[in-house]
């Protein structure tokens, strides 16, 4: 139990008028540590108990069980709690040393599934930094949900259907080179796509031909289907090479095409429930009672189904297949209206499990303040960016530690980790400006800074030849150690907050705080001096490294032991 929860529970025993959660939220940290570690203001009880806050504080301080604390004193209208730092540090260190990387593992999920729709790039289009956010936020949330006891199901809902495939088939049949496509699938397919679109601007027959090929594809034509499948397979090979570099895996690659034969059921269900209304020849579902002004357009006047129809089919399939406790869509904020409609239509269909669906939105990545766009050529491709980040990391590692073994693997961990961490430390609803130099810096609030703190601790532990014993009691009570102990003790709550808010930046900021607190401790404390505190300090180092490494893992970032 963390200290705030302990204090709230002890106060609740003598103040039945307030819920423990309300007490927890009222607790304050005094500005001056001489006034205690935490304080409870008695003002909130004045009306209920009809007494002055000073009198309430004085009476309650007498009633609270002091055995868990160093002391409990009333100071004016506050009850001030002085924690038994030696006792708490001993408990926290024992928990981390005993559990190792399982420290702070929780069982909220009880093994239930969480479906995570993430990454989802378009086939035959380059994988840019714009796709990175959905990929790394989704991957981090998968780690967090697993730590909370859920079973994450990571779904890459590929953009593998649409009229652009008609254009691609026309282009490939005109100018395609099988060997070139196999060597560089995305580059070659993109060149073909750009070239055919340029030709279509002056030749109207191109569009007609593309429409005809897409119609053939929809009808299951053998040649069209084989070409589409080949474009998809070759693109996916290239995407998977990138995912391997990012250390991101998926449980399903069911993309848009997978739901082609599942949309008729959606239309039948909507029809059976009398939810479809005709509007200008199209079929819509009115959602005004959900505060949504624009109806959901289900089927166009020409009979074509729309994106939302496909997403309805996907939602039904995922519920039946995974029986999810939560279904999470990690998609840019520009799709907010779409996901509000999606949830509302499912609710209207009588599916209360739509309440378990969450759009985890995020802001844009810009470059020099400008929005990135594949169409305008203002795009940052991920593959060369990752390579550049690794090179920059390698240069810094070479300068700091030229004799480091396994330099390539460490440079990869630092370069890739730098890009991921920079993205994840940003509150997801905020965008950020892409700055590779800032990302790969070993100074400031960066991934390499946190990784370096972890590597520094591992170096200390190697020099000391120290491994903690689960049967030894370690304890510290000095102010610098206490700052670190408080953070380590707070780790389970940080994981829960990150999970509840679908917000990996909470975890990233925690990792930065812990690294900063340790570096401050390292600067002021002679850890390796041979005195009575040596093993206690080394146990603290061990616990800090364990939690730092786990915090980074939950962000999808590796923690090298040497840098």
Swiss-Prot record:
EC identifiers of the protein: 6.1.1.19
Motif ('HIGH' region) on chain: 121-131
Pfam (any one): DALR_1
Broad class of enzyme this protein falls into: ligase
Annotated localization: Cytoplasm
The entry's keywords: Aminoacyl-tRNA synthetase, ATP-binding, Cytoplasm, Ligase, Nucleotide-binding, Protein biosynthesis
UniProt catalytic activity: tRNA(Arg) + L-arginine + ATP = L-arginyl-tRNA(Arg) + AMP + diphosphate
UniProt main location, coarse: cytoplasm
HAMAP family: Arg_tRNA_synth
PANTHER family (alphabetical): ARGININE--TRNA LIGASE, CYTOPLASMIC, ARGINYL-TRNA SYNTHETASE
GO MF entries: arginine-tRNA ligase activity; ATP binding
Protein name: Arginine--tRNA ligase
This protein's GO CC annotations: cytoplasm
Any one GO BP annotation for this protein: arginyl-tRNA aminoacylation
SMART domains, A to Z: Arg_tRNA_synt_N, DALR_1
Signal peptide: none
Assembly information from the UniProt record: Monomer.
Entry keyword Cell division: no
Recorded superkingdom: Bacteria
Family to which the UniProt record says this protein belongs: Belongs to the class-I aminoacyl-tRNA synthetase family.
